[in-house]
Design a protein with these regions (language model features):
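C-terminal subdomain of alpha/beta-hydrolase-fold enzymes, centered on the catalytic histidine
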Residues: 1-127
Length: 127
């Protein structure tokens, strides 16, 4: 019974569901942003999701993440799928931030990165 129950529970597991993001057609560009020591979405949660999807960590690396390849930025069509190339990656920021309502300098960098990504499908970072 427990094996059967586990298969039902697995469908709701975010780490398992996250892997499907790049298995569906068409694959869409994907930017994931992580604020080091975030207390809203814990880094461990973000990292499990990113590992499950198979995304790289884009430079600059603020904290190494086990199981993620480090790639240079900017990123454009940097990952391959059976349907072709797409842009995706994880970027890190030095502090917890909010780009809603102004936020910190890091928040402004994160917002600029997100806007640029949405406009160009290119992931840019700055050191």
């Amino acid at each position: 019974f427990s094996a059967l129950a586990q298969t039902v529970v697995d469908e709701g597991d975010p780490a398992i569901a996250a892997a499907r993001v790049v298995q569906r057609s068409p694959v869409r560009p994907l930017l994931v942003q992580e604020a080091i020591h975030d207390t809203t979405v814990y880094n461990q949660t973000t990292e499990v999701m990113v590992r499950s999807i198979g995304l790289p960590l884009l430079e600059p690396e603020l904290e190494a993440i086990n199981g993620l390849e480090l790639e240079p930025a900017p990123a454009v069509e940097n990952l391959a799928t059976p349907d072709g190339m797409f842009t995706a990656g994880l970027t890190q920021f030095n502090e917890e931030h909010s780009f809603f309502g102004g936020g910190s300098a890091e928040g402004q960098r994160a917002l600029h990165q997100a806007i640029t990504f949405l406009q160009t499908e290119r992931i840019e970072t700055s050191e």
